[in-house]
Amino acid sequence: MAGTKEIRTKIKSVQNTRKITKAMEMVAASKMRKAQERMRSARPYAEKVRNIAAHLATANPEFKHPFMQEREVKRVGMIVVTTDKGLCGGLNTNVLRAVTNELKTLQGRGVDVQATAIGTKGMQFLGRVGAKVISHVVHLGDTPHLEKLIGAIKVQLDAFTNGEVDAVYLAYTKFINTMKQEPMVEQLLPLAADKLVQTEEEKRAYSWDYIYEPDAQTVVEELLVRYVEALVYQAVAENMASEQSARMVAMKAASDNAKNVIGELQLVYNKTRQAAITKELSEIVSGAAAV
């Protein structure tokens, strides 16, 4: 059995670790609230752009944007959104497992895949599995900015427009609530008509039209690009909210475990100290009896 000095050292070490995890838990909780607010703030913009794009697409059926043209799928682009840092539980593991399953399915059908990595963990994963990475962006920080994402996203959008890929998928972690985050792999392009016009009521509402300057086609082309960019930004915002929630939960679990370990070590320390005192008393009594 370890001596009291060694046990005290272990207790001190675990206490120091608990201070770190507790501080990280509090920081993650603060960042989580900001990330959730950022995520909620991004939704109205994406929804408004969708409404306008849907109105244009419905009122002008003669024009079909390249983003809405379906082709036989032989090549696929995949945008993989992960975190830059670890210590967030199984968040990255879960979304990368979903990506792995999707890659196996696509490759099993003879489909070539080229990827875009958003986040260091995804970049490292794609490098390990030997995936073809055509663009990437890392170190986004706690506040993602669309201008930093656009370059990497545009590579995939241009590849789709030019016919280099026939579909683009988006993999990220969807924020459900503080305790639950769900890995998602969704088709980003081509845009399905029912994704723009989601209800019959919307379809009827969009049957009338505006007068556009310079023309409807130019407006649609610009709006759909902005809409797809907004979808990717929303996915990044959701992923960041999920990251901070998962990190807060993971650090709380680590702090609770450290507290339990400290309690167990304290019990062992007390027993060891009691045994040492009992032994000393026995030796004193034995010595006195011998005299």
Swiss-Prot record:
Q: Which GO terms describe its biological process?
A: proton motive force-driven plasma membrane ATP synthesis
One GO cellular component term of this record is:
proton-transporting ATP synthase complex
Task: Name where it's found.
Answer: Cell inner membrane
What name appears for this protein in its UniProt entry? ATP synthase gamma chain
What's the gene? atpG
Top-rank taxon of the source lineage equals Bacteria
- Single GO term (MF): ATP binding
Q: How does it sit in the membrane?
A: Peripheral membrane protein
Q: Which organism is it from?
A: Cupriavidus necator (strain ATCC 17699 / DSM 428 / KCTC 22496 / NCIMB 10442 / H16 / Stanier 337) (Ralstonia eutropha)
Give the similarity note: Belongs to the ATPase gamma chain family.
**Which InterPro entries is this protein grouped with?**
ATP_synth_F1_ATPase_gsu (IPR035968), ATP_synth_F1_gsu (IPR000131), ATP_synth_F1_gsu_CS (IPR023632)
Which Gene3D superfamilies does its entry note? Answer: 3.40.1380.10, ATP synthase, gamma subunit, helix hairpin domain
Note the coiled coil stretches, chain numbering.
none
Q: What is this protein for, i.e. what is its function? A: Produces ATP from ADP in the presence of a proton gradient across the membrane. The gamma chain is believed to be important in regulating ATPase activity and the flow of protons through the CF(0) complex.
Keywords assigned by UniProt, alphabetized: ATP synthesis, Cell inner membrane, Cell membrane, CF(1), Hydrogen ion transport, Ion transport, Membrane, Transport
